[in-house]
Design a protein with these regions (language model features):
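Non-heme di-metal
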Residues: 1-222
């Protein structure tokens, strides 16, 4: 539990840092995902730390966290590679050992943490594929600007309201700061109990991991 808590603490700090980079690069889907994952990691760190205390132990988070520096794509790739690494040493069978010892409480908390890791991996892989398909944000915005100009070019001053309105609508739609919004979720929802995470619009009425009412989920949206 202590090792899991410390890993979660480090990852939450990393994801907060990566969210700031994504914001600077105007990769808003990645920013929302990193912020949601950072929140989920903090919840799972708390759950593990609380279990340690309830079982009679003590927990102290790491005093220093080294954060990586790179582009949003680099940060997604690095995070994905780390998440794909199999557990090592005692961490490989920590859930099984907890179950064999009859400590279902510790096992449940560790299962929430492990399932969260797999959920984050899948969401990051999807986010990175979207980012690669759409290209850098600056290039998307440049293309969007050209489309906006083309949509209004050549329209006479007394052109019909329908033609003029159509050009303006296309321009405003494609020149949004977050040009990935056409094929990206509008945000993410995080269960406040176990840290389970969903793309907005694809959540359950109740969290399947801990049965928390979906109306309590924390939203990370535009």
């Amino acid at each position: 539990l202590d090792a899991c808590s410390r890993r979660k603490h480090v990852k939450s700090a990393q994801y907060d840092h990566f969210a700031g980079i994504a914001r600077q690069e105007r990769e808003h889907d990645a920013e929302r995902l990193f912020r949601a994952m950072a929140h989920a990691e903090r919840l799972q760190e708390y759950n593990c730390a609380n279990a340690i205390v309830r079982l009679g132990g003590r927990y102290a988070p790491p005093e220093h966290v080294t954060v990586f520096r790179g582009t949003t794509d680099d940060n997604l790739r690095r995070s994905i590679d780390f998440a794909r690494r199999p557990p090592e040493g005692l961490h490989a069978d920590d859930i099984e050992r907890a179950l064999q010892s009859g400590n279902r409480y510790a096992a449940r908390v560790l299962i929430w943490a492990r399932s969260g890791d797999m959920r984050h991996l899948a969401l990051m892989e999807t986010c990175r594929r979207r980012l690669a398909a759409n290209g850098p944000a600056d290039a998307r915005n440049e293309i969007a600007g050209r489309r906006a100009n083309n949509g209004t070019a050549g329209v006479p001053a007394n052109g019909t309201a329908r033609a003029s309105g159509r050009g303006t609508a296309e321009g405003s739609e494609n020149s949004r700061p977050d040009a990935t919004a056409d094929n990206a979720p509008k945000g993410y929802l995080v269960c406040p109990t176990c840290g389970n995470i969903y793309p907005a619009g694809c959540s359950d009425s109740y969290c399947p991991c801990c049965l928390t009412d979906g109306r309590r989920f924390v939203a990370f949206e535009e």
